[in-house]
Amino acid sequence: MRSNFRIAMVLFAGVAIGSIAVEGLHAQGAKLKAYVVSESDVLDAKAQAAFIPAIRKAMAETHHGRPLYTATGRIVPIEGGSPPASVGISEWDSLDDAVAFYKSKAYTDLAPQRDKAVKVIRRFVVEVEK
C-alpha cells in the first residue's frame, strides 16, 4: 500500500514539475504589450475630427494595433506641470509592433493630415512590465 502511495506521489510531483517547466518555456517567448502615449496641441479642431478616424483605421489595419483609446478625452493634472491639450493612448501587442507602425507607410501617409490637425509635443512607447 505504501509503495502505491509513493508511486502516486512521484507521478504527481513529475507532472507538477513538468507543468511548471512548460509554463516557464512558454513565458520566455511571450512578447510584452506596449502602450503608445502621444501628447499634442490641437491646431485645428475640424482637421483633428477628420484625422482621428483615419488614424484609428490605419492602426486597426496594420501591425496588430488595437484601437486608439482616447484622443479628445478630459485631462486632469495630478502632479507636475500643465497637461497637454490632447493625449492619445493606444495599445499594441508589443513594443516592436508599435514602433513598426509609426515607421510604416500607413502612418507616414497620414503625416500631412496629422500636421494640419495637431502639433505633436511628445510621443513615446511604454512596454508593460512582466
Question: Which residues are covered by each model-predicted region?
Answer:
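Short S/T/G/P-rich N-terminal loop/turn motif that feeds into the first structured element of a domain
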Residues: 18-105, 126-130
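Alpha-helix boundary/capping and short turn/kink residues
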Residues: 10, 104-107
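Residue-level marker of structural boundaries
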Residues: 57, 107, 116-119
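Short, exposed beta-strand-loop hairpins at the edges of beta-sheets
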Residues: 99-102, 112-116
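Bacterial N-terminal signal peptides that target proteins for export
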Residues: 1-12
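Short alpha-helical segments used as structural interaction elements across diverse proteins
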Residues: 3, 45, 111, 119-120
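C-terminal end-helix/capping segment
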Residues: 115-130
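Terminal signal-anchor or tail-anchor transmembrane helices
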Residues: 10-20
